[in-house]
């Protein structure tokens, strides 16, 4: 049996969106999924526990088997938990070295210089290689691929000795093949004893990696689902008869009018040409398979730069 890391029994929490009742439990080297009925309320409040924004007001809390109060829990989370969410910190100036050293644990400045030496240690070099992150430390964050950015975030958690890693909805950001590569990096941390919470709305992802799924319904921990129960039982607990909640909504066909924008043979460096129309009364969806197209289109439309040839009409 794995050693317990953190446990909160009958925990009452207060956030800007109201009151919540959560039971939290995870052990060293354990990966637990958290599936919520409403991410904007319960999901945000639960996630904010690990960002220090949701306040523990009542209940019993334990860290490594020791009973602690609200202040002790807040301090433990601040020192031992790190959240990696789907938003990317894309700086044009900061490097990988800055990201690992300067942006983490600023309240432990005395550790900075020993950490600088550890960046080139055999252990750090080996971990980087095993994660597939073979780039110089001087590489700018903005020049990293989406996958490498998240690999670096996982490495940062390991390098700084965080005991609890929280991943928030990365299935909404990464392509499936890249997500599998990232989870290989997460598995390395699990084998080192790091505990991992997965916040996500992709049940297949949860079923694959979670040793348990905590189901949040009605602003409280409603049920704990174990692998032998994985499947339709999840949706039954959430009251989503017939499958996942989004399936209840029917597709609404929109009547598209005349084109308001026509793009022909738009070329960007290292990308195939693009041709598309956006019509009046239409919601256009552009799927970005290489993570760079969306940024380059943004620069093209709003920054008036970035393309090599093509025309608009």
Positions of predicted regions on the chain:
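Pre-NBD coupling/linker segments of ABC/ABC-like ATPases
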Residues: 2, 110-121, 224-262
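Q-loop/switch helix immediately C-terminal to the Walker
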Residues: 87, 92-112
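Conserved ABC transporter NBD signature motif
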Residues: 59-67, 75-78, 310-313
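Hydrophobic anchor residue at the start of the ABC signature
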Residues: 153-154
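H-loop/switch region of ABC-family ATPase nucleotide-binding domains
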Residues: 199-201
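Helix-to-loop junction immediately C-terminal to a conserved catalytic motif
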Residues: 51, 302
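Conserved ABC nucleotide-binding domain
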Residues: 127-144
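Glycine-rich P-loop/Walker A and Walker A-like loops and their local beta1-loop-alpha1 context
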Residues: 33-48, 285-299
């Amino acid at each position: 049996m794995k050693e317990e890391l953190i446990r909160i029994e009958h925990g009452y929490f207060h956030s800007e969106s109201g009151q919540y009742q959560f039971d939290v439990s995870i052990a060293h080297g354990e990966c637990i999924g958290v599936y919520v009925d409403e991410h904007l309320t319960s999901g945000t409040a639960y996630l904010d526990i690990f960002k220090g924004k949701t306040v523990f007001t009542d209940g019993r809390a334990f860290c490594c088997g020791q009973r602690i109060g609200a202040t002790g829990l807040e301090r433990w989370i601040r020192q031992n938990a790190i959240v990696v969410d789907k938003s990317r910190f894309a700086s044009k100036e900061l490097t990988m070295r800055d990201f690992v050293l300067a942006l983490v644990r600023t309240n432990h400045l005395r550790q900075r210089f020993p950490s600088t030496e550890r960046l080139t240690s055999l252990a750090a070099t080996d971990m980087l290689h095993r994660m597939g992150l073979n780039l110089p430390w001087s590489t700018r964050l903005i020049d990293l691929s989406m996958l490498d950015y998240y690999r670096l975030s996982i490495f940062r958690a390991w390098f700084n000795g965080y005991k609890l890693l929280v991943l928030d909805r990365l299935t909404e950001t990464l392509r499936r093949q890249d997500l599998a590569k990232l989870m290989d990096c997460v598995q390395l941390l699990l084998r080192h004893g790091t505990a991992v919470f997965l916040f996500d709305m992709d049940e297949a992802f949860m079923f694959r990696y979670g040793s348990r799924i905590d189901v949040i319904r009605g602003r409280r921990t409603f049920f704990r689902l174990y692998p032998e129960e994985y499947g339709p039982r999840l949706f039954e607990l959430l009251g989503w008869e017939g499958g996942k909640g989004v399936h209840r909504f029917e597709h609404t066909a929109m009547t598209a009018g005349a084109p308001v924008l026509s793009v022909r043979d738009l070329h960007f460096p290292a990308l195939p040409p693009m041709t598309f129309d956006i019509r009046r009364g239409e919601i256009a969806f552009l799927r970005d398979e290489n993570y760079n197209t969306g940024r380059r289109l943004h620069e093209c439309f709003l920054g008036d730069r970035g393309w090599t040839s093509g025309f608009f009409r």
